[in-house]
Amino acid sequence: MSISGTLSSYYVDSIISHESEDAPPAKFPSGQYANPRQPGHAEHLDFPSCSFQPKAPVFGASWAPLSPHASGSLPSVYHPYLQPQGAPAAESRYLRTWLEPAPRAEAAPGQGQAAVKAEPLLGAPGELLKQGTPEYSLETSAGREAVLSNQRAGYGDNKICEGSEDKERPDQTNPSANWLHARSSRKKRCPYTKYQTLELEKEFLFNMYLTRDRRHEVARLLNLSERQVKIWFQNRRMKMKKMNKEQGKE
């Protein structure tokens, strides 16, 4: 009971004391009670000031101070970002993302970040070429000789001209050049070999006009097409007529 009595008296005294202190300023002018309140302020100065321990900086020494040149060149709105000085080796392994493949070969000691990993080079479709690796051709000498022999086989001049090409091809990337230098549909003249010309002359002297069967046989023997044999005989007859006209005029 004594404890409860002391507590109740303490609360009552505190309420009464605060009301008694706050009441005079409300009833009377502030000038009369200005001086008595000053000792109260002096009493509060006796208490020791609160001292807080300084906290460690969040980022530490990793953030370097801004250089005056960078701050002067850029406006005040944009703050230049400076890369941290150096991250510990233990933290660097956690900076790697799971998408980045780990390098297979480690850099030599002393090179540091200057070491560059050799990237594969793209060659033909389905092939990867690395730097510093020699290229080997799968074609042997026997295979090359076989290809050359196949190219030399047959008559070199007996090829049928299937299309004409200009002597100077225009630039394929320039449409105006393609339009100005359009290729003509006329085919090139295919010269006959001496053997073919001799055999055709013999056949012409024997008969100026060939039947279809004979023309097919001559084309097969001379490795020509029936159309080539037919055109050659037509040109030969026109040439003979021209020669006869010139001889008649003389």
Curated annotation (Swiss-Prot):
Subcellular location: Nucleus
Xref: SUPFAM superfamilies: Homeodomain-like
Keywords, sorted A to Z: Developmental protein, DNA-binding, Homeobox, Isopeptide bond, Nucleus, Phosphoprotein, Transcription, Transcription regulation, Ubl conjugation
Basic and acidic residues compositional bias, start-end: 160-171
Listed SMART domains: HOX
One GO-annotated biological process of the protein: cell chemotaxis
Name the record gives this protein: Homeobox protein Hox-B9
Source organism per UniProt: Mus musculus (Mouse)
Upper taxonomic lineage: Eukaryota, Metazoa, Chordata, Craniata, Vertebrata
